[in-house]
Amino acid sequence: MSYFPWLTILVVLPIFAGSLIFFLPHKGNKIVRWYTIAICLLEFLIMTYAFCYHFQLEDPLIQLKEDSKWIDVFDFHWRLGIDGLSLGSILLTGFITTLATLAAWPVTRNSQLFYFLMLAMYSGQIGLFSSRDLLLFFIMWELELIPVYLLLSMWGGKRRLYSATKFILYTAGGSIFFLIGVLGMGLYGSNEPGLDLERLINQSYPTTLEILLYFGFLIAYAVKLPIIPLHTWLPDTHGEAHYSTCMLLAGILLKMGAYGLIRVNMELLPHAHYLFSPWLVIIGAVQIIYAALTSLGQRNFKKRIAYSSVSHMGFIIIGIGSITNIGLNGAILQILSHGFIGATLFFLAGTACDRMRLVYLEELGGISIPMPKIFTMFSSFSMASLALPGMSGFVAELVVFFGLITSPKFMLMPKMLITFVMAIGMILTPIYLLSMLRQMFYGYKLFHVPNKNFVDSGPRELFLLICIFLPVIGIGIYPDFVLSLSVDRVEVLLSNYYTK
C-alpha cells in the first residue's frame, strides 16, 4: 500500500502550476503553449506511473486512499481514492486534456488566461473522479463550471455569450437539486453531518426520502449527461465554443454526469435506482431515436455532431438502467469510447470550420479535393461513431445490447421492444453521419466558398488525430484491456445491490 499523496498531487498540480502562467515573460504565446503542454504531459506521466505501480487491478476496493481533516469546524475531510469505476475516467481526462491543449495552439487572444482555465478545468475533473466525500464531490462539480463558463463566453462564435449563459443557467439550476440532495443525505439520521462515501454506502433511508434524493441527483446529472429534455444547452454550446473547448466538453464534461449517476445514484441509493431503472432504459431508448432524428434535420454540421453525442449518451443510460454486469461494463466502455470519438469529431469540425468559415451544409461541397487528410480522418472517425466493427463504438454498443437482453429485471417483450428501438437508432446514425460527409466533402460547391486558399492538416493536427485513433482501434480489437479495469468493481457493486 502506498501512503504517498499521489491523488492530491494530481488534483492540485494543474491549477497551481497553471497559476504560474501569469508570471511567465511576455514574449509571445509560444512559451505559454509549451509550458501548458509540459504541465499536462507531466501530470499524465505521474498519473500513469501511479496507476501502473501502485494500483492493483484485481482489488475491487478503493485504493490510493487519502483522508485529511480540511475544515475542522464542519468536520470536513479531504478524502480521495480511486477504484475501477474512476480509473478509466481519470486516464481519459489526462489523455484528452493533453491533446486539447495541443489543439488550442492557434489561440492567441488572452492565451495565458485560456490555458490557465484549461488547467483549472483539469484539476476540477481529476478531483471529481477521485473524491470519496460527497461534499468534496459537489465542490469539484461546481468549481468546474467557472472555467467552462469563461472558456465559452470569451472564445468562440458570435453567439458565444448566449450559449455560455444558457449553459450556466442549466447547470446551476441542476446544482441546486444536487446541493439539496447532498445536505439531505448528510443530515439524515445524525446530528453531525457526515458525507464519507464509505459510510453512506451502508446508510438506509425511508423509501420516499430515497426516491426524492435520487430524483434530485438525477436532475443534476441529466443536465450534464445530458438527458432529454434537459439537453438543449449542448447544441448551442458546441455550435459556438472553440473546438479545443468542445473537445473537453464532449470528451470529459458529459461523462461527469454518467459517472455521478453510477457513483452516487446507483451505489448509494440502490432501492430507488431499482425503481427508476425501467424509466432510465425507456428514456435512453427514446433519446437515441429523438436525437438521431433531430440530428438529421440540422443544417449546421457542428450541431449535427452535437445531437449525435446526445444520441450516443442514450446507450450509456440504457447500460446503467439494465442493472447487469454486462450492461454496466458496456456503459463504462461507451463513456470511454465516446470520449475519444466525440472529442475528435468536434476537433475535426472546428479545424474544417476555421479553414472554410462556413458551417451550413448546403453551402459546402467538394472540400475533399483540397483537404484529403481532413476528409480521411473525418470519414474514419465517423465510421467509429456509427459503430463500424473493429472500432470502439461497435464493441461498446454491442455490450450494452447484450446487457439489456440478459437483464433479469425486464420481461421478454419490453426487452425486444427496447432492442428494436435501439436498432433503429443504430440505423439512423449512418444516415445522418454519411449524409453529412457527402454534403461536406463531395459535390462541386467548392467554387462558391469565398476563401479558396484551403490548407490541409499539418503535422500537429495529424499527430493529434493519430494519437486518438490508436486507442479507438485498440479498444475495438481488444476491449478486454478496458473492461478489465472495471469488471471486478462492477461485480462488487451489483452484488451489494442485489443483497440490499
Swiss-Prot record:
Coiled coil: none annotated. The chain crosses the membrane at residues 4-24, 35-55, 87-107, 111-131, 134-154, 167-187, 211-231, 242-262, 274-294, 313-333, 334-354, 386-406, 417-437, 462-482. It is a multi-pass membrane protein. GO terms for cellular component: chloroplast thylakoid membrane. Disulfide bonds: none annotated. GO terms for biological process: ATP synthesis coupled electron transport; electron transport coupled proton transport. It comes from the Eukaryota. One of its GO terms (molecular function) is NADH dehydrogenase (ubiquinone) activity. This is NAD(P)H-quinone oxidoreductase chain 4, chloroplastic. It comes from Saccharum hybrid (Sugarcane). The gene is ndhD.
